UniProtKB/Swiss-Prot annotation:
Localization per Swiss-Prot or TrEMBL: Cell inner membrane
Any single Gene Ontology cellular-component annotation: proton-transporting ATP synthase complex
SMART domains, sorted: AAA
Protein name per the record: ATP synthase subunit beta
Keyword Acyltransferase: no
Enzyme Commission no: 7.1.2.2
Family annotation (SUPFAM superfamilies): C-terminal domain of alpha and beta subunits of F1 ATP synthase (SSF47917), N-terminal domain of alpha and beta subunits of F1 ATP synthase (SSF50615), P-loop containing nucleoside triphosphate hydrolases (SSF52540)
Function: Produces ATP from ADP in the presence of a proton gradient across the membrane. The catalytic sites are hosted primarily by the beta subunits.
Length: 484
């Protein structure tokens, strides 16, 4: 029986389907023989280009409903369609580093084909319980404010919140750079439904700041996968999975991988467009009824296994600043940490502009990070919180009206604020200051001394844009010498 079934499948592969209906990104295909399974990739030609369709529904009477991964303009009824016999497969491996590809794994950076030893289907099962590693470990980023106050979990998920122009891209590039330096790990960046211009800028900035090499190859640290705003919903709904598949391959080879998604909201938005086109009845606020399932299936694949880890940083757009909107609310359920970038901090010239009071992490637990780290982090936060509550009094009455204790708190808080800044490797090109990667022990030691008053005698300026406390002390000596 099994042998008799084989020719049928070959017939399907050789193109036994025909287009019967095209409505936007949804294409119905009728097959004479065996129907392709759900999620299989079908191929047809459109205006001389390869058009990939993904099977979404079986409608009966040998018709399948598919989602197009590219524009369907120019597609006609009766056109022949071939079943590839497998889901969408994309190239994976070291050859993808430094390159940009689209949802179906085709290069879009005009640097020639991506030739890899193997390909991998974009739909994979999440690792089983046996494969998963449950040990709580911190991923040290070398960025003081992150490591001290909102540490990232290895294999965890981090939400990155911030408006336009507060330094999201620079922070992302620094994380890519530091993970490559400190852990020898690679990164994958999935541009989901964002501006093509920003994607292009990121690509060129990565080359300028030596994160990637032009045309890929030796020395490149990140693979880029784009499905931007101008693309059909099918591509935007699947491009995060394409990026995740490349990251999973690196993880299975024993790497600690960073996986960036910009923007996770667009993944949900594309899913809701596809859902409406497939004729599903919408759920709350017009989102797809399968919102939680779609999000869960993707997020559960991002995890630490016995082989390696995928740590995911996801930029999250909050529509109309409504945190109760189903799309961001569903994302929050999966997050281990949040990094909030604040415009008010960026306005002070403090970069990275991470808000030390708004950013949170479930890893900041004495059982995980240790008693000393936890105590120092909480003292830093309480000092900053006290300073924040005194700012109104300072604005109205001035510093002189404060008690001696409050004056000391304000002085320390201002030093802490400045010490939370640090020069980035990827910004060297623009600032001229060499970047600093700070070890966690040095970060804890420095801030412990600050909150305990060991450095009360040093001027504020000494703490601005330095790495470790030793550098701040050196800078203070220089400033004193210059003043003299």
């Amino acid at each position: 029986m099994a042998k008799a079934a084989t020719p049928k499948k070959t017939a399907a592969v050789n193109g036994a389907g025909k287009v019967t209906q095209v409505i936007g990104a949804v294409v119905d295909v009728a097959f004479e023989g065996e129907l392709p399974p759900i999620l299989n990739a079908l191929e047809t030609q459109n205006n001389g280009n390869r058009l990939v369709l993904e099977v979404a529904q079986h409608l009966g009477e040998n018709v399948v409903r598919t989602i197009a991964m590219d524009s369907t303009e120019g597609l006609v009824r009766g056109q022949s369609v071939a079943d590839t016999g497998a889901p969408i497969e994309v190239p994976v491996g070291l050859e993808t580093l430094g390159r940009i590809m689209n949802v179906i794994g085709e290069p879009v950076d005009e640097a020639g084909p991506i030739v890899t030893a193997k390909k991998r289907a974009i739909h994979q099962d999440a690792p089983s319980y046996v494969e998963q590693s449950t040990e709580g470990q911190i991923l040290v980023t070398g960025i003081k404010v992150v490591d001290l106050l909102a540490p990232y979990a290895k294999g965890g998920k981090i939400g990155l919140f911030g408006g336009a122009g507060v330094g999201k891209t620079v922070l992302i590039m620094e994380l890519i750079n530091n993970v490559a330096k400190a852990h020898g790990g690679y990164s994958v960046f999935a541009g989901v439904g964002e501006r093509t211009r920003e994607g292009n800028d990121l690509y060129h900035e990565m080359i300028e700041s030596n994160v990637n090499k032009l045309g890929g190859g030796e020395g490149s640290k990140a693979a880029l996968v784009y499905g931007q705003m101008n693309e059909p919903p099918g591509a935007r709904a699947r491009v995060a999975l394409t990026g995740l598949t490349i990251a999973e391959n690196f993880r299975d080879e024993g790497q600690d991988v960073l996986f960036f998604v910009d923007n996770i909201f667009r993944f949900t938005q594309a899913g809701s467009e596809v859902s409406a086109l497939l004729g599903r009845i919408p759920s709350a606020v017009g989102y797809q009824p399968t919102l939680a399932t779609d999000m869960g299936q993707m997020q559960e694949r991002i995890t630490t296994t016995n082989k390696g880890s995928i740590t995911s940083v996801q930029a999250i757009y909050v529509p109309a600043d409504d945190l109760t909107d189903p799309a961001p609310a569903t994302s929050f359920a999966h997050l281990d940490a949040t990094t909030v970038l604040s415009r008010s901090i960026a306005e002070k010239g403090i970069y990275p502009a991470v808000d030390p009071l708004d950013s949170t992490s479930r890893m900041l637990d004495p059982m995980i990070v240790g008693e000393e780290h936890y105590e120092v982090a909480r003292k830093v936060q309480s000092t900053l919180q006290r300073y924040k509550s005194l700012q109104d009094i300072i604005a109205i009455l001035g510093m002189d009206e404060l008690s001696e204790e409050d004056k000391l708190t304000v002085a320390r808080a201002r030093k802490i604020e400045r010490f939370l800044s640090q020069p980035f490797f990827v910004a060297e090109v623009f600032t001229g200051s060499p970047g600093k990667l700070v070890a966690l022990e040095d970060t804890i030691k420095g801030f412990k001394g600050l909150v305990n008053g060991e450095y009360d005698s040093l001027p504020e300026a000494a703490f601005y844009m330095v790495g470790s406390m030793e550098e701040a002390i050196e800078k203070a000596k220089k400033l004193t010498a210059e003043a003299a």
